Amino acid sequence: KELISAIQKAGGLKPMKMSLSLSEMASMIERVGKRGDAARGEKIYRRENLQCVACHAIGEVGGVIGPNMVSIGASAPLDYLIESLLEPSKKIKEGYHTNLVTLKNGDAHAGGIVSESKTELVIRDLTGKHNRIAKADVASKTISPVSLMPVGLTAQLREDEFVDLVRFMSELGKEGKYKTTTNRFARAWEVLPAGSPNPGTVHHYGAQMFTQEFSGYKWKPFYAMVGGGIPVDEVPVALKRRADEYQVLRTHVDVAKEGKHKVRLKGDSNRMDLFLDGEPIEIPADRTETDLELDCKKTGKRQLMLVLQGAKSSGQVSLEALSEDLTMLNSL
C-alpha cells in the first residue's frame, strides 16, 4: 500500500472523491474536456468489476438493468454525467427507479417494472432476471428513491481514470467513432472462460474441437466495443497446452436464404480459425482484413465460432455481415 501511495503521489494520481463542490465540479468539467481520453475511457467502462456493461446496453448489446447509453453523450451535459456516476440516486431516469414488491407470504422482490397488467406484473431484478408475479399475491408495491446503481462504484477509480470514463460517455451518440453505426457487426458474443476443461482432443482435432458440444464448457457473455471490434487482450485464454493458447468466441447469425453469403473478418488471419456450424471456413494467410464466403445450406439461426491461436496479443478482431441475407443476432 505504501508503494502504491508513493507511485500515485509521484505521478500526481489521486483516488476519486465521491462528491464535488461547485468549484470542484467546474474544474472536473474542464479536465474532462482538456485531458479526458475516450479510448482509455471505453476500456475502463468495460472493466468487469465496474459492471457497466452488465447493467447498461450501448445500442443493441449489453445489460438491460439500467438505461441504454447509446446517445447519452449527445443528450446529457457533463455535469449530469459526472453527478450520475458519483451520486446515482440523484439522477434516476424515468422508468428505472427501484420498485419494492412485497408478497403476502412475506417474500420480496426489488428491481425495475418491465410490464404490468390487471393480473400480473413482471419485475426485472439486479441480475437481469424477469420475475412474474400474480397481482393477487402482492401485499404492497413501493418506489424507492434509491437507484439500482450502487453508490461507490467509481470509488475504485483514480481521478484520471474517472476523467477518461466521463469523456468516453460524453462522446456516445455524437458524430464520430463513438456513435453506434449501421455496420452489421457481430457485437454479442460468448467466450470460454480461462481454465475451461479440456476434453483431451485438442491435439487430434485442433481448434475444431471447440465446435463440439461439451458439458464442461461454461460460456460467458462478451460484447464488442462501440466500433464493432473485439479487444483481443480482453478475451480469456480458454485453454493452454504447451506453447499453444486458445481464445474461443462464438456468435450467431440468421440466414434468410440458402446460398453463398459474404462476411468480412478483420484481424491477424494467421492466428484465426472460423467455423460455421462446426465446419471450417478457409481463411487466406497473411491478411489483416479479408472477405470470406459462407456456404449456407440451411436457413435460420446458425452458429459462427472464432478461435484465436498463439500467444495472447493486443489489437482487435471483428466480424461483419456483408450480404443482405445475413443478420448478426446481437442478443444472447
What are these regions (language model features)?
Residues 3-34, 166, 170-237, 242, ...:
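Accessory carbohydrate-binding/adhesion or oligomerization-edge regions at the termini
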Residues 274-318:
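Beta-strand-rich ligand-recognition modules
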Residues 15-47, 77-80, 104-106, 151-154:
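Electrostatic cytochrome c docking/interface patches
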Residues 241-245, 249-262, 293-299:
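Extracellular and analogous surface-interaction loops
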Residues 253-255, 259-274, 304-306:
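Aromatic-lined ligand-binding clefts that engage carbohydrates, nucleic acids, or primary amines
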Residues 3-13, 27, 107-109, 113-119, ...:
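C-terminal capping alpha-helices of c-type cytochrome domains
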Residues 62-86, 98-143:
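Gly/Gly-Pro-rich "capping" loops immediately C-terminal to redox-active cysteine motifs
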Residues 48-59, 69, 165-169:
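The canonical Cys-X-X-Cys-His
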